[in-house]
Regions:
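Membrane-lumen/periplasm interface segments of specific transmembrane helices
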Residues: 185-285, 392-405
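Signature aromatic-anchored transmembrane alpha helix within multi-pass, membrane-resident enzymes
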Residues: 191-194, 198, 261-273, 293-336, ...
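Membrane-interface transmembrane helices that cradle and orient dolichyl/undecaprenyl
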Residues: 93-96, 132-148, 158, 180, ...
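Short acidic/glycine- and proline-prone juxtamembrane loop motifs at membrane-interface regions
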Residues: 11, 117-125, 348
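Transmembrane-helix signature of polytopic, membrane-embedded enzymes
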Residues: 88-110, 126-127, 142, 146, ...
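Transmembrane-helix motifs of polytopic, lipid-linked glycan transferases
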Residues: 75-99, 131, 135
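Membrane-embedded, lumen/periplasm-facing catalytic core of multi-pass transferases
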Residues: 379-457, 462
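Loop-to-helix entry region of an early transmembrane alpha helix in multi-pass inner-membrane enzymes
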Residues: 53-60, 65-86, 115, 119, ...
Length: 488
């Protein structure tokens, strides 16, 4: 499903990853030694970038060997998607009787498809996360120390990909304690990912006199919106979780009996409408200063219903089974959700991606013990539901690709303008727009060092990131073009 998007332009944070990868191709030992303007001022990457370098090294390897064309890089990123899919299926075979349903419910989500079309770290994290989980569970099932050792290595590679990989250590520990009858000395293996994290941090400190792990805390403290309440973050998190696991939300008609479906739908829709209405009265916490239209409130309520279903599934699982696998999935979902809502700097699909396979497996496990009167009819319903979810997810991914294309087209248009303009043309903004403006040879505006002269132009995209207002005391303050990057 990702193949149609291999020509997708560089988008969102892809631009930073590609820029760092090109630097690594020239100087791999000093991987974060370049300066990059990502918030309006050029700063060394090691001062602000909040993730380990593994994915950038992978991009550098691919770009050096095969070139930096978008289709080359996106083709290379099919590998982590394949690994994540294989690991999800391997784990689902151990945890449920319908592994193909769990796999399809994972793949047919907007979270998986959109993340799979990016050049960022999230699909690689999911691949190593799922490999670590699958090999750890398989190792205990077989009593194999080799599987457990490979799981520990994958956990370390997850940590080298994104620091969220540290969540694997407590999850694997809890599962091992619940399965503590065999094999022995498993705890020694969990020192492997810990040692890999320490080694990565030690190298960054000796190279830059700076622990990269501390950047995570700085980003959260500097960027997180502080005037939102715990309740508001919960609403946002539930709505995002519902959208990320759209396939499982659609399966609700199969997973619950008629009375529960009716009762749950009425209850959660009523609560959702009430909560969204109350929250929409506060123009700061949820709506960013604008009033939500009725249609948006309805969609928001549906997403809240889907997000709430995750915890209904978790409760049902623990009530009926409460085996080590149930606790593993429950803690996996709860921990990821808490991290995405209350730890990371903003609630986003990328942070919630790791819980998608766990939710899909919970849904498949529920199908294992519910009474099915007509199995063939139920299977047809499941196939239909997952097909609809796949179509919706592909349409969302297509819209995201069109947004990326619009940024590239705008950059090329303003690049042509810069070549014919007599003064100097600068630009603000980041993401893919920044990448293609650099390709077009347009200078980036730096709030600290740029001095504007009469006749200069500053291009300011209104719906981009970190676009700073031009001070009125600048000579050329009135000679700037503000525009919105949007679909045609």
């Amino acid at each position: 499903m990702l193949v149609p998007f291999i020509s997708k332009p560089v988008h969102i944070d892809d631009a930073a990853y590609v820029a760092i990868a090109k630097h690594i191709a020239k100087d791999p030992a000093d991987y974060y030694g370049l300066s990059l303007n990502w918030d309006g001022v050029a700063r060394p990457v090691y001062e602000w970038h909040a993730s380990p370098p593994f994915v950038k090294f992978y991009l550098a390897f691919i770009g050096t060997l095969f070139g930096w064309k978008e289709w080359v890089l996106h083709t290379a990123f099919l590998l982590p998607a394949i690994l994540a899919s294989a690991a999800t299926f391997l784990l689902a075979k151990r945890l449920c009787k319908r592994p193909f349903v769990a796999l399809a419910a994972t793949l047919c989500t907007p979270a998986f498809i959109i993340s799979g079309t990016s050049l960022m770290l999230d699909t690689w994290l999911l691949a190593y996360f799922m490999l670590a989980m699958a090999l750890w569970v398989e190792g205990f099932a077989r009593g194999s120390i080799r599987y457990l050792f490979c799981a520990a290595i994958c956990a370390g590679l997850a940590l080298w990909t994104k620091y969220f990989g540290i969540a694997l250590i407590p999850l694997l520990t809890v599962y091992a304690l619940l399965k503590s009858d065999r094999p022995k000395y498993w705890w020694v293996l969990l020192l492997v990912p810990t040692a890999m994290l320490i080694a990565e941090q030690a190298y960054s400190y000796f190279t830059y006199r700076h622990f990269l792990f501390t950047n995570v805390a700085h980003v959260v403290m500097d960027e997180r919106i502080s005037d939102r309440t715990v309740y508001t973050w919960l609403l946002i998190g539930l709505s995002f979780a519902g959208g990320c696991t759209f396939s499982v939300m659609q399966l609700g008609g199969v997973l619950w009996n008629g009375r529960l479906r009716l009762l749950g739908t009425l209850l959660w829709l009523a609560m959702s409408f009430l909560l969204v209405w109350l929250t929409s009265r506060d123009n700061v916490t949820l709506t960013a200063g604008f009033k939500l239209p009725t249609v948006s409130i309805f969609v928001y309520a549906v997403l809240l219903l889907g997000g709430s279903q995750l915890f209904s599934l978790t409760y049902s699982e623990l009530r009926h089974r409460a085996d080590p696998e149930s606790w593993l999935l429950a803690l996996w979902i709860a921990g990821t959700f808490f991290f995405a809502c209350y730890v990371t700097w903003s609630v986003n699909v990328r942070s919630l991606l790791p819980l998608v396979p766990a939710v899909a497996m919970l849904a498949a496990r529920r199908l294992d013990f519910i009474e099915v009167v007509n199995p063939k009819k139920t299977n047809r319903r499941i196939v239909t539901i997952l097909s609809v979810s796949a179509i919706v997810s592909l349409l969302i991914a297509r819209a995201d690709m069109e947004w990326a294309q619009s940024q590239r087209e705008a950059a090329y248009r303003y690049g042509d303008f810069a070549k014919s303009h007599h003064g100097t043309v600068y630009f603000q903004g980041h993401w893919g727009f920044q990448h293609y403006m650099h390709e077009a040879g347009v200078a980036q505006f730096d709030a600290k060092t740029t001095v504007l002269q009469p006749g200069d132009v500053v291009i300011c995209p209104r719906n981009n990131a970190n676009v700073r207002p031009i001070p009125r005391d600048y000579t050329a303050a009135r000679a700037h073009d503000q525009f919105s990057i949007a679909h045609r």
